[in-house]
Amino acid sequence: SNDTKKWHTLPEDVALIEGNLKAIAWKSGRNNRILAFNLNIPIVKNNIDICLFDTTMEGYGNGKIVREVDRILMLGELKGGIDPAGADEHWKTGNTALTRIRNAFKKEGKDIATSFVAAAIEKKMADEIFNQLKKGTLSFATNLTKDEQLVNYCNWIIKF
């Protein structure tokens, strides 16, 4: 939790859990995974909304894992605004952040998976996103308002 800096098992009543949730841990086959949110990643020199690490709860070290570039599996941008009029602006800022992430890792000779999650995706930006997905520039994109897409995104992360 944000308050105690300790790992907790999931409570039965998860109402309002997002206020204290900083990271989620699980085991995928033989791999340990941590999905964390809103962390400053030093190599990128910026806060990143969605961060997936290859590590255990102990290895996470209350977020110190951000300095271990080889443990970072995926970084993603989350844009929650639902106003279609602002969707294009969200994509522009999100895409700029994702480009910054890829460039920072490229300077270190590393590849990084990236994702874009948004509550509003309009036609023009959908075409740009699709082209990036086809080229492999962007690893995954999803619309938060489409349940099937959100489930697919969660499955992609879980199986990473």
Indicate where each model-derived feature is located.
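Catalytic core segments in nucleotide and nucleic-acid processing enzymes
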Residues: 7-160
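A structural/positional concept
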Residues: 1-2
